[in-house]
Amino acid sequence: MSSNMQAMKQMRPALVSLTQQQARRRCFKLYRNCIRSIPHLIQHYNLSYNMSEMRNRFRSNFVEFEEVTEKNQLDRLAFIGETELFDAMSLLKTRSHVVNYFDTQPVNAKTISESEKLLNNFFE
């Protein structure tokens, strides 16, 4: 059985985690499923990205939320990620949806221009 089908079979409906560790395990499982689904996404959506670019994009999204520790927030993020991945793997999304996801760069920190720094210092 291919890893794509294996990744599809491991997706489950959203459940409420009993503990924080269980919620974190769900997030790690989602990350593994995202990485396993990359060849399927490239093939079916005819993407021009290589695997390392897509892997880095998935990783940046997970790193963005690594400081979330509350069980309910982890469950919510895992549910959103699972449904998005399920829609993409089930070909419910169009190619433009998937391309837009990989084209947009994650916002890390707001860059402050010199004029904004001056105004911030002035009003402090």
Curated annotation (Swiss-Prot):
<keyword id="KW-0249">Electron transport</keyword>
<keyword id="KW-0472">Membrane</keyword>
<dbReference type="GO" id="GO:0045271">
    <property type="term" value="C:respiratory chain complex I"/>
</dbReference>
<comment type="similarity">
    <text>Belongs to the complex I LYR family.</text>
</comment>
<keyword id="KW-0496">Mitochondrion</keyword>
<dbReference type="GO" id="GO:0005739">
    <property type="term" value="C:mitochondrion"/>
</dbReference>
<protein>
    <recommendedName>
        <fullName>NADH dehydrogenase [ubiquinone] 1 alpha subcomplex subunit 6</fullName>
    </recommendedName>
</protein>
<dbReference type="GO" id="GO:0005743">
    <property type="term" value="C:mitochondrial inner membrane"/>
</dbReference>
<comment type="function">
    <text>Accessory subunit of the mitochondrial membrane respiratory chain NADH dehydrogenase (Complex I), that is believed to be not involved in catalysis. Complex I functions in the transfer of electrons from NADH to the respiratory chain. The immediate electron acceptor for the enzyme is believed to be ubiquinone.</text>
</comment>
<keyword id="KW-0999">Mitochondrion inner membrane</keyword>
<dbReference type="GO" id="GO:0031966">
    <property type="term" value="C:mitochondrial membrane"/>
</dbReference>
<dbReference type="InterPro" id="IPR016488">
    <property type="entry name" value="NADH_Ub_cplx-1_asu_su-6"/>
</dbReference>
<keyword id="KW-0679">Respiratory chain</keyword>
<keyword id="KW-0813">Transport</keyword>
